[in-house]
């Protein structure tokens, strides 16, 4: 809760931390899906460094660049929706997908799948396309009821919020509403729950991909506790990454008096 307090105390520092975590989130969420383009290259792509025309290297590398920037734009959009406390809906989920893939995959961006799919590396078989809208609508109603009943943030409510984030995250992974990009949408929707409640992004690092996938395998629509437990671990690691930054800001404030961070 200390970083939650410091974020409120130093809004400019919080904004900078959110930018850093957004970039980190975009990179690692993409690498979890495909390790062929390593995160060191995704960092180059995200910051538009290196050669200007990425297609000169390969079409796949250029596609990775487009999708990475699309995801970063989608996360920015989610932050604005979170500030308005917009309820989760199918239209929100479709807009998330559309913003991410509108340039790299225009014919499929924001479109719910119309055929059955299998998930690579997972034993779970997603529901038939005819059941997607009904499942999402029912589950989103339950998630919204729990999420927007949260009145304040406390150590006790934090774990409730984490469970809601896990429920939203697992739901999208379970239903697999799109032909592609479901993992990225699932992780982003879980983060949306955290953002609505004033928390930071929960960045799942690729180093823990196997642990993450195992936690998903152990979940069901009635019990997302295994994922919630994993998210607790990954969120603590995320906070550890930004703690030193806030300590620098706090130390300067104590030494020099309130500065621009106020």
PLM feature spans:
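FIC/Doc superfamily catalytic core
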Residues: 1-180, 184-262
């Amino acid at each position: 809760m200390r970083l939650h307090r410091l974020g409120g105390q130093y809004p400019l520092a919080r904004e900078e931390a959110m930018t850093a975590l957004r970039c980190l989130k975009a990179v690692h969420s993409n690498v979890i899906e495909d390790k062929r383009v390593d995160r060191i290259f995704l960092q180059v792509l995200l910051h538009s460094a290196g050669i200007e025309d990425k297609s000169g290297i390969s079409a796949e590398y250029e596609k990775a660049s487009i999708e990475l920037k699309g995801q970063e734009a989608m996360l920015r959009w989610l932050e604005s929706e979170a500030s308005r406390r917009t309820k989760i809906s199918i239209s929100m989920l479709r807009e998330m997908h559309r913003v991410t893939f509108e340039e790299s995959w225009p014919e499929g961006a924001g479109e719910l799948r119309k055929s059955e799919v299998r998930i690579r590396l997972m034993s779970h078989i997603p529901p038939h396309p005819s059941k997607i809208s009904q499942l999402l609508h029912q589950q989103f109603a339950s998630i919204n009821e729990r999420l927007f009943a949260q009145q304040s943030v406390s150590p006790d409510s934090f774990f409730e919020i984490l469970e809601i984030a896990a429920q939203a995250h697992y739901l999208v992974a379970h239903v697999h509403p799109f032909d592609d990009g479901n993992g990225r949408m699932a992780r982003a929707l879980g983060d949306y729950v955290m953002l609505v409640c004033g928390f930071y992004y929960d960045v799942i690092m690729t180093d823990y991909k196997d642990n993450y996938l195992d936690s998903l395998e152990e979940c069901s629509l009635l019990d997302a506790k295994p994922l919630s437990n994993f998210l607790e671990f990954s969120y603590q690691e995320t906070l550890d990454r930004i703690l030193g930054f806030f300590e620098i800001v706090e130390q300067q404030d104590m030494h020099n008096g309130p500065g621009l961070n106020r």
